[in-house]
C-alpha cells in the first residue's frame, strides 16, 4: 500500500494548481482568449487610467496586476500578460491581464507562464499596439534571455515588472541597425541599464551592462 502524503506536503501543489484559476474561469473568452496558437486581450482595463503619456499608464500596471490571483505568489504564482495600445487619437490604454500560457518548472515547484498577446480587442475601434507587458510573481526578477530574444518580440516596447514592482523596459529595435536598450524605472525616470549591442546579441538576448548615470 502506498503511503499517504501529509497534507502540508500537498498544500503547495494545490495552491500552484489553483493560482489564477478562478480569474481564468470567470474571464476567459470575455477579457482574454485564444485564436489558434495566439492570445488576444480585451481593453480598456478600467483599473488603469488612460493617458497621453504612456509612462503614466505603465506606472499603474504593477499595483493593479498584483491584486489579481496568484500574481505575487512567488514560485507558485501566476504571470499575467497584457498590452498597451491606442485607438489612433493619441491616448494610451492598457488591456486586461491574461493568465493564458503554459506551466513551467521552477526548481521543485511549477509556475504558470503567460503568453504575450498578439491582438487587442476594443469595441470602440481599431487598436494600435505599442507594447506588451508581463508580470513575474517573485522578486527580484530582471529581464531574462527569453524576454529579450528577437524572436520573442511582438511590439515596439516590452514592459516587465516583478512582485516588488521593479519595472523594466526593453526597446528591441528589432528591424533597426541600432542596439536594443534595457531600462529600469526609478523615481519616475527611465535609467539605462544595458545594451544589446549587435544583431547577434539581439537574436540571443545577450545584454552588455552599462553604468547607470
Model-identified regions with their sequence ranges:
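Sec-dependent bacterial lipoprotein signal peptides
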Residues: 1-16
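Intrinsically disordered, low-complexity sequence elements enriched in Ser/Thr/Gly/Pro
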Residues: 2-6, 109, 156, 183-184
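Glycine-rich short-loop/terminal segments
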Residues: 19-123, 201-213
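Active-site-proximal loop/helix of nucleotide/amide-processing enzymes and allied scaffolds
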Residues: 21-24, 114-213
